[in-house]
Amino acid sequence: MAGDSRNAMNQDMEIGVTPWDPKKIPKQARDYVPIATDRTRLLAEGKKPRQRYMEKSGKCNVHHGNVQETYRYLSDLFTTLVDLKWRFNLLVFTMVYTVTWLFFGFIWWLIAYIRGDLDHVGDQEWIPCVENLSGFVSAFLFSIETETTIGYGFRVITEKCPEGIILLLVQAILGSIVNAFMVGCMFVKISQPKKRAETLMFSNNAVISMRDEKLCLMFRVGDLRNSHIVEASIRAKLIKSRQTKEGEFIPLNQTDINVGFDTGDDRLFLVSPLIISHEINQKSPFWEMSQAQLHQEEFEVVVILEGMVEATGMTCQARSSYMDTEVLWGHRFTPVLTLEKGFYEVDYNTFHDTYETNTPSCCAKELAEMKREGRLLQYLPSPPLLGGCAEAGLDAEAEQNEEDEPKGLGGSREARGSV
């Protein structure tokens, strides 16, 4: 009996029966067809359109839907108002002042109505709470004069109205709070360093090429302003969906890309454009990615540049991203820095330009094995680029190899040359 159940279980696993409800699969994985095997569960990818995780401008394409606990936004009301767009912020700014003026204007009119001041308009012997207050419009104007502290003119409060004096104190205090809150919100929104990021540039493409006999992923950053970014730092992340060995689908998994954190190269002195380099080593997520695999993979590299604005001391952040189609294999960036009389000049017309260079099409793992076996000479610069010393070094190495070979097996140089 136990053997029959075990055989039935094995048959179910072989034919690919899925034990879970497809409706419970995450939304990001619904375009994938689950396949069950005896070792692991794989997801066969279906056709779906590509979508950027982050725009080139730094805007994240993430929408927060079905948020039920909306009260959390009200608990942090100041940040919520600052994050609003300008048109909504100005609308809230106008509505708050208008509502407070109308509210206190109604209370001033209500006091005058209860005291009977509206029935004795023009009576010289009657002492009203507020002189020359004849209706709701005049009460509304008196509320504006009180809250904005522009000074009383035709309408003024009298000393025979204690409830009016208390209301005057309350409106003055609440008006100051509203002014501090709304003006502070507008000031913070105006002084945000988001516009400073507009003058921080990222290259349109990232490149992969050889640098110091190692494959490197590189991109270029620059600052258009003469005022520098203080304590500038750069970091990068690889955004790529993956599946664990247990069959769990992780959409938009984030993996750190080392751009010099261990050596301090991630701390930038951004006076002129800099090329940020990521060495593709064993710890790199691109360790086993070749040129052919680059065109088959789907990933996105997000780069984040942070620093303090020199003029204000506020933290500024600029972001950009590179999809797999924007990573050029076998390219280098065109130099933009030239030496002039007494200064260095940066030509931003060629900031995004690249040129092709001799780069192996294999992955960094295979390249490291070739280097250990001494088969890396074909990817080094050609002899005219290396100069006479390199040519002499290659000739000396060839002569040394001839001397080391047995005469019976090696033959003469002329014989090998003819072959």
UniProtKB/Swiss-Prot annotation:
TM stretches of this protein: 87-111, 164-185
InterPro entries linked to this entry: Ig_E-set (IPR014756), IRK_C (IPR041647), K_chnl_inward-rec_Kir (IPR016449), K_chnl_inward-rec_Kir3.4 (IPR003277), K_chnl_inward-rec_Kir_cyto (IPR013518), Kir_TM (IPR040445)
Signal sequence range: none
Modification Phosphoserine occurs at: 5
Intramembrane segments: 136-147, 148-154
Annotated Acidic residues bias: 394-405
Tissue expression as described in the entry: Islets, exocrine pancreas and heart. Expressed in the adrenal cortex, particularly the zona glomerulosa.
Alphabetized GO MF terms: G-protein activated inward rectifier potassium channel activity; inward rectifier potassium channel activity; voltage-gated potassium channel activity involved in atrial cardiac muscle cell action potential repolarization; voltage-gated potassium channel activity involved in ventricular cardiac muscle cell action potential repolarization
Stretch list, region Disordered: 390-419
All ranges on the Cytoplasmic side of the membrane: 1-86, 186-419
Site label Role in the control of polyamine-mediated channel gating and in the blocking by intracellular magnesium, positions: 179
Pfam families from the UniProt entry: IRK, IRK_C
Segments on the Extracellular face: 112-135, 155-163
Compartment list: Membrane
Short sequence motif named Selectivity filter, residue ranges: 149-154
Subunit and partners: Associates with KCNJ3/GIRK1 to form a G-protein-activated heteromultimer pore-forming unit. The resulting inward current is much larger. Associates with KCNJ6/GIRK2 to form a G-protein-activated heteromultimer pore-forming unit.
Family: Belongs to the inward rectifier-type potassium channel (TC 1.A.2.1) family. KCNJ5 subfamily.
Name listed for the protein in its UniProt record: G protein-activated inward rectifier potassium channel 4
Gene that encodes it: KCNJ5
